[in-house]
Amino acid sequence: MDEHPNKFYLFGGYTLWNEHAWSPSDDRVRGGKSRSLLVCSADSAVATFSGDLDITALGGAGFASQRTVDPQSWDLLVYQGLSLGVAKSDGKKYTLVLKDDTPPKRPDGREESTVSWEYDFVPGSETEVTASWADFKPTYRGKPKPDAAPLRLDHIKRISIMMRSFFGEQQGPFRLDLNYIAAIRAESMSED
């Protein structure tokens, strides 16, 4: 058997979803009112990321996200990207976020800001979204950070799914049903 399959399921697929492996990280940490949930189907085959994106409290800005709980660590060096199996989508724009470190805590208990690697996508229902590592762009507090050190693919510590306003572009209820999140090898990448 191949030590590194073409598709390595991080969540879903042969690795069932576990809602306890995820935690909310919403704009409430900055005084916002957005909320998110990640709930698994009865058979743990599908995870529903849903909530309400409220942009009124932060002047047109806002975000609602679910992130993996610490500690986690994935070595994805032999893979070329990530794939999301989408069961159902509301047609809104989502962001997949990777971190290669665990942010330290500030004295007030909140996490310090660190570089994130982000990929924006608008999924259809019953589709597969694929993103190569080059599709993930470094950001710091939501702004591009072109001088960031390269993403350490052998040291991925956190994965997040985010709904954000893109400064007033979208708001309100959202829902994305996912079959899986998987690391993929070149053989599995779809041609554009």
Predicted feature residues:
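Beta-rich carbohydrate-recognition modules and glycan-binding surfaces
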Residues: 1-192
